[in-house]
């Protein structure tokens, strides 16, 4: 977060972990496939590029897994804030989504993706989702907030979302695909009843069954 290129996004760290996890499987599969093809033909007739690709893909998968290991360690130490994961680190070292913040103390996406990515430590995944439920599930309004409290008076400059009225859109309102990620995370943790409840809660149909609700 910031224009100096020093800021880091925690949720994108989880996203990168997931991407590397999926691509390492592809690289490993492709490398093993080429390896089997190598064994099936006479070495004299082997296309040299296939041999190079076999070694390259296996090494690529190993490199990705090493990056994943380092990412997971960093996310579960530097980004863990005691009850949930922070959202981001700004250029100047300030944090978003920290318990210490007056605004944007907690963000939904970092909690959801700790589970979706598979990178969150087992106990921390459950603790962070409990915090999400406590601070971001608004059953009265029927929404799952992106963050809370919204940006309004603090000196933090997170970008364009601060221009939105507090409690609307990304600034403390519902960011719907972020809300869906929270529901997916609940389901992945085995809380099917909660996932169903929250899905029904945010369903637009449930917000327009009567003229008053609409």
Describe the predicted segments one by one:
Residues 1-214:
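Acidic, mature catalytic/reactive cores of soluble proteins
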């Amino acid at each position: 977060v910031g224009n100096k290129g020093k800021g880091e996004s925690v949720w994108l760290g989880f996203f990168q972990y997931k991407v590397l996890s999926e691509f390492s499987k592809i690289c490993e599969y492709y490398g093993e496939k080429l390896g089997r093809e190598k064994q099936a033909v006479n070495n004299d007739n082997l296309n040299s590029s296939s041999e190079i690709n076999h070694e390259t893909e296996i090494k690529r998968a190993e490199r990705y897994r090493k990056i994943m290991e380092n990412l997971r360690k960093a996310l579960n130490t530097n980004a863990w804030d005691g009850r949930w994961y922070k959202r981001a680190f700004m250029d100047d070292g300030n944090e978003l989504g920290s318990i210490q913040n007056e605004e944007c103390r907690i963000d939904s996406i970092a909690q959801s993706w700790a589970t979706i990515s598979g990178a969150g430590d087992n106990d921390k995944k459950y603790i962070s989702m409990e915090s999400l439920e406590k601070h971001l599930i608004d059953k009265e309004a029927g929404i799952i907030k992106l963050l809370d409290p919204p940006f309004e008076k603090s000196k933090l400059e997170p970008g364009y979302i601060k221009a939105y009225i507090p409690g609307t859109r990304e600034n403390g309102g519902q960011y719907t695909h972020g809300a869906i990620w929270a529901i997916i995370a609940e389901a992945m943790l085995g809380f099917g009843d909660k996932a169903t409840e929250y899905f029904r809660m945010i369903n637009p149909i449930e917000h327009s069954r009567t003229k008053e609700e609409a």
